Each structure stands twice: as structure tokens, then as C-alpha cells.
Amino acid sequence: MADLDKLNIDSIIQRLLEVRGSKPGKNVQLQENEIRGLCLKSREIFLSQPILLELEAPLKICGDIHGQYYDLLRLFEYGGFPPESNYLFLGDYVDRGKQSLETICLLLAYKIKYPENFFLLRGNHECASINRIYGFYDECKRRYNIKLWKTFTDCFNCLPIAAIVDEKIFCCHGGLSPDLQSMEQIRRIMRPTDVPDQGLLCDLLWSDPDKDVLGWGENDRGVSFTFGAEVVAKFLHKHDLDLICRAHQVVEDGYEFFAKRQLVTLFSAPNYCGEFDNAGAMMSVDETLMCSFQILKPAEKKKPNATRPVTPPRGMITKQAKK
């Protein structure tokens, strides 16, 4: 592991941030051995910390990024680049967007630089069978090689699965599981692990809330379940929690409440895949556990030769929401 001692994190972060202000899409080509070092060192840190993180406010929580690197940089511009703010990301760093490598490398670099202030959970796309298909494998193969993709897989298999903020906000990528009776069950999951096709770990990364379901329902994804508002209320009451914070679904405003504000979905990739007009959002949790939302507005759609009124530059809108 002598190579890890030579890992120059500051230089890696500096190069990844140099493209700020460049035209979106400009790549940062790190050396292969640097990326390998990021995977190995962050993996070590993930395994040294709990699989169920216990975090303290204040912090900022972000949903799916999906390789939209320049939008990730915008999130940090609005929220403050680490270590100015503490962060928790809810997974789905790779696939679908054009710059999964820059995205995951910056996040892993910040994890290594600020291990007690910067946290990354596992999403359903941090799984070999998924990111083999939806873009990350192809990006690794095109820009580096398949061996590097396998190194990322070894790292992803060690990511934490859930977090609880100040004993009151339960955070995971997907949602609840009919198998989840005690937090101890999450703590007992051994890493490294792949994501199974069913069961607790699968559900935490794959399930979805559904306002039309009573109890548990079938999931259109063909994986895991959907769950209704009553499931949320019972879970919160049983574990003395106030809120579930999850990602995993595109929502128009970047955030969306469910079950009388007992659950919030966060999605942080605006104009997702270039196909949606959604905003992206980040949730700020202050010391009193008041939650507010910072919104990344979607880019204006350019209409050829159409005259349109001048609009102020797109930017941040903060909405207060009492929890």
C-alpha cells in the first residue's frame, strides 16, 4: 500500500476543480494510478466507519448526481465547497451522465480529505450489475480500462448504506423495507457486499414511496417494493424519528414531500439526462433540524429564433420548510 502514501489529494482536488468556469463537458483526465489510489484509500475509510452512519447537523444533503459533473460543481458553489459545509450524498454518483469519472473522483477525494465531514451513501447504481449497463462501465473502458471499473466495484461494495442525523432524520438512497424491524439489522450487514436481488439491503437502495398504496405494493421497477404513507408513519413512530430523507426518483422541483411531510425525496441532477425539465435540490439541515432547500434551476430550453423576455441569471432559490 506504499502507493497510497504518495497520493496527492490536494493536487487531485485542484485539478478536478480547475474546470470551474469552463464550458460544461470539459474532461479532467487524472492518472490511472491516482484514481486507483482514490478507490483504495476511500474504501479503507468506508470500512473504518459504520455501515449505518450517525451524523450531526448542520449538514447539507444531496440526492442523485448521475455523472452530471458541472451540476455537482454548482451544488458546491451554492452550498460551499468542503470543508465550508458538511455534506451527505445519498448515492447514484455514476451512470447516465457524461462525466461519471470526474463526479465520483471528486467525491472520493473529498471523502479522503475530510473523512469526518463528508459522507457518501450507496445508491442502486453503485452496483456492478447496474453500472455495467447504464454507462459507467463504458466510460471507464473508453477513458481508461476495464480493470479500473473493477477497482471501483471493490470500492462501491464497501460504501455505507444509511445514515441517521441527530437521531431524528433517517437517510438512505431508496426507502424502507418490510424486513427492517431494528436498526441493528443494518449494522449487521457485512462489507464488502454486492447488492442482492431481494431483502433488506436491496430494499434500502431500491424501494419507492407510493401515495396510492396501502402498506406494501409491487414496484414497477421489477425490484423491491413500494410503500404507503402509513408504513412511513409507523416506522417513524417506532424508531422515534421525525423524517425519512431519500433520493432515487426524479422529482420536478428537486425535492418533494410525501406522507404529510414525513418523507422527502431529493434529486440533485437538474435537466436529468437532458430529457427532463426538472430542477435539482439540496437540503440544508441546521442545528435545530430545520430543513430548507436550495434549488438548482433547470437550464433554459433554447428555442431557435424565438424572442423571449430577458430573465435574470439562473441561480439559487432558497425555500424554507419547517419539519
Curated annotation (Swiss-Prot):
The modification Phosphothreonine is found at T307, T311. Mn(2+) 2 binds at D64, D92, N124, H173, H248. Pfam families: Metallophos, STPPase_N. Keywords: Acetylation, Biological rhythms, Carbohydrate metabolism, Cell cycle, Cell division, Centromere, Chromosome, Cytoplasm, Cytoskeleton, Disease variant, Disulfide bond, Glycogen metabolism, Hydrolase, Kinetochore, Manganese, Metal-binding, Mitochondrion, Nucleus, Phosphoprotein, Protein phosphatase. One of its GO terms (molecular function) is protein phosphatase 1 binding. Its cofactor is Mn(2+). Mn(2+) 1 binds at D64, H66, D92. Protein phosphatase that associates with over 200 regulatory proteins to form highly specific holoenzymes which dephosphorylate hundreds of biological targets. Protein phosphatase 1 (PP1) is essential for cell division, and participates in the regulation of glycogen metabolism, muscle contractility and protein synthesis. Dephosphorylates RPS6KB1. Involved in regulation of ionic conductances and long-term synaptic plasticity. May play an important role in dephosphorylating substrates such as the postsynaptic density-associated Ca(2+)/calmodulin dependent protein kinase II. This is Serine/threonine-protein phosphatase PP1-gamma catalytic subunit.
